[in-house]
């Protein structure tokens, strides 16, 4: 069967779903889908030897990193697939697979005494030509019914103690206002199995910034991957999340709104998105201030239907993660949308196609590395999705496979098998690696009858990051005359009397602001306080390529209209 014929079977369903609406909208959607089909066919018919992002996710719930032999196994397996980088989960739930003084080693995981998993992995991966990007799962911090054994654990200090929620400002957890029993428990603090930090709490936000910065200072990783940098999905399709007492008090002080905001209140929703965007930029710029060549990437929520408008997505409207903006304004180096769908199920296969069509045309100035749920798919489905994702990600994009350990699934009556409808078993890793390289299992069986070649037939480097040579950043703090942080101040960069920076830079609960990537040059800063007072900095700041300019601005009534620089 020719590749275009096989692809067209699924495209028919995608087209039929988009054929309702205004004729101009129909035409645009039709063109997007057809372009994706053409790109996928072209990618399927020739081996792409150009630089691409090829990543494997090493999830440490399923991959062992407790000994030198474990590390050697991970590196050998990754090398066998012809990927060029690893997203290695070194923080799962408030723990550390590296030697860190603030967070404990993971519980219930065998790690040899004194052994440094991350340090050993960096050395061995680099020798094998693989980059190591430290994946830190930031939001969820605990998942068991029993308390952490180590008293240093952030959940013990700032979550629950002796079965009761920590009271007052020392409680950093987010919560829902919905009653328990609908996917939540423990007074609305537990979502499924997990407890999450509330990044509307200034101390929680500062904690993860310190965590990431400290790791970058101590380990020569090639990148940091910010995972679960959003609010958790509240149950039953709601937006009832973010109701940490300190966060709500900040919102009330900022807006003057009395009482608890409603879950669908527009200002409350925008405030929650603002917290995640501000933290994302602060994490990015703080890490790049330590090592400018570092690649900072972020996981993008891609559950639910593909966007007609990103504002209708689960990411934007329910987890308050506007990764669409970050890809378009340079808030991070790489966005990794997690499009985890099963290819053998018609409903999820259609969702996958719709997401790929949208991602191919999505506005962006940074690469998209599309993450696929290998654990959900047969090997046939994984290869099909990989080709489509590579086409959708564009010339400077790529894909990430989740995960190294959970790399394929058995499927009963698999419509993608040859002949169709056979039960396909879970293949051993050796078959997965062989199929990625050659299109065949170790026994020589062709996996995808429509395409004989492997998708990773040869090794390639990951793409360069040229924007790093043409962009810089500003990291600053706004204080009042007493030295207290100013929460919610708007900051603009003004070049030669013309506002030059984005209009959405806002100080967080610590008074800190960080810009997305800006053009090198000399800037004066404009500050608008939450009360509406307008101030212009009495100094200029020089932003250089690959540089992070730092300053503190002081706004006070005694100097009307002037923000003093320190």
Roles of regions detected by a PLM:
Residues 530-558:
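Structured interaction patches on ligand/partner-binding surfaces of diverse proteins
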Residues 521-532:
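A short, solvent-exposed beta-strand micro-motif common in secreted/extracellular proteins
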Residues 70-95, 219, 332-334:
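Catalytic domains of carbohydrate-active enzymes, especially glycoside hydrolases
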Residues 51-54, 63-64, 134, 139-214, ...:
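Active-site-adjacent "subsite" loops/lids of carbohydrate-active enzymes
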Residues 323-324, 331-348, 358-464:
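Substrate-binding cleft of secreted/luminal carbohydrate-active enzymes
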Residues 495-517:
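Short, acidic Ser/Thr/Gly-rich low-complexity loop/linker segments typical of extracellular
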Residues 474, 480-500, 520:
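Short, ordered, surface-exposed loop/turn motifs in non-cytosolic proteins
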């Amino acid at each position: 069967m020719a590749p275009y014929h096989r692809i067209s079977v699924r495209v028919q369903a995608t087209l039929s779903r988009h054929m309702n609406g205004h004729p101009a909208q129909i035409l645009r959607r039709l063109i997007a889908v057809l372009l994706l089909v053409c790109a996928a066919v072209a990618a399927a018919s020739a081996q792409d030897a150009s630089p691409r992002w090829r990543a494997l996710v090493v999830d440490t719930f399923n991959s062992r990193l407790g000994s030198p032999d474990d590390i050697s196994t991970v590196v050998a397996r990754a090398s066998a697939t012809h990927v060029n980088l690893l997203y290695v989960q070194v923080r799962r739930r408030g723990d550390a697979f590296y030697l860190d003084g603030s967070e404990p080693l993971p519980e219930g995981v065998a790690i040899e005494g004194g052994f440094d998993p991350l340090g050993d992995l960096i050395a061995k991966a680099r020798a094998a030509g693989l980059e190591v990007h430290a994946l830190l799962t930031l939001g969820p911090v605990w998942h068991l019914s029993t308390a952490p054994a180590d008293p240093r654990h952030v959940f013990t200090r700032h979550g629950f103690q002796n079965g009761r929620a920590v009271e007052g400002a020392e409680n950093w957890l987010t919560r829902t206002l919905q009653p328990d029993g609908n996917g939540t428990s423990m007074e609305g603090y537990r979502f499924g199995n997990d407890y999450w930090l509330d990044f509307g709490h200034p101390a929680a936000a500062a904690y993860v910034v310190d965590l990431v910065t400290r790791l970058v200072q101590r380990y020569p990783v090639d990148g940091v991957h910010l995972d679960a940098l959003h609010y958790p999905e509240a149950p039953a399709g709601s937006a009832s999340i973010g109701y940490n007492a300190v966060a709500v008090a900040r919102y009330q002080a900022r807006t003057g709104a009395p009482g608890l905001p409603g879950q669908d209140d527009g200002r409350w929703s925008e405030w929650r998105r603002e917290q995640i965007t501000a933290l994302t930029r602060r994490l990015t710029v703080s890490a790049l201030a330590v090592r400018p060549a570092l690649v900072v990437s972020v996981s993008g929520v891609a559950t639910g239907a593909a966007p007609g408008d990103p504002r209708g997505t689960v990411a934007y409207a329910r987890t308050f993660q506007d990764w669409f903006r970050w890809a378009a304004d340079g808030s991070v180096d790489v966005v990794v949308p997690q499009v985890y769908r099963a290819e053998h199920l018609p409903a999820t296969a259609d969702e996958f196609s719709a997401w790929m069509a949208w991602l191919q045309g999505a506005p962006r100035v940074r690469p998209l590395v599309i993450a696929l749920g290998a654990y959900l798919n047969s090997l046939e489905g994984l290869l099909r999705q990989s080709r489509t994702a590579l086409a959708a990600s564009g010339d400077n994009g790529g894909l990430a496979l989740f995960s190294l350990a959970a790399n394929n699934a058995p499927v009963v009556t698999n419509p993608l098998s040859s002949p169709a409808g056979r039960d396909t078993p879970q293949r051993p890793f050796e078959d997965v690696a062989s199929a990625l390289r050659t299109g065949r299992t170790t026994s020589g069986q062709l996996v995808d009858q429509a395409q004989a070649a492997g998708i990773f037939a040869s090794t390639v480097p990951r793409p360069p990051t040229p924007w790093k040579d043409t962009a810089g950043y500003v990291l600053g703090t706004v204080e009042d005359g007493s030295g207290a942080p100013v929460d919610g101040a708007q900051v603009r960069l003004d070049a030669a009397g013309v506002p030059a920076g984005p209009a959405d830079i806002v100080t967080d609960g610590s008074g800190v602001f960080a810009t997305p990537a800006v053009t090198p040059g000399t800037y004066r800063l404009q500050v608008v306080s939450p009360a509406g007072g307008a101030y212009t900095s009495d100094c200029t700041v020089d932003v250089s390529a690959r540089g992070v300019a730092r300053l503190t601005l002081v706004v006070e009534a005694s100097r009307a209209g002037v923000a003093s620089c320190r």
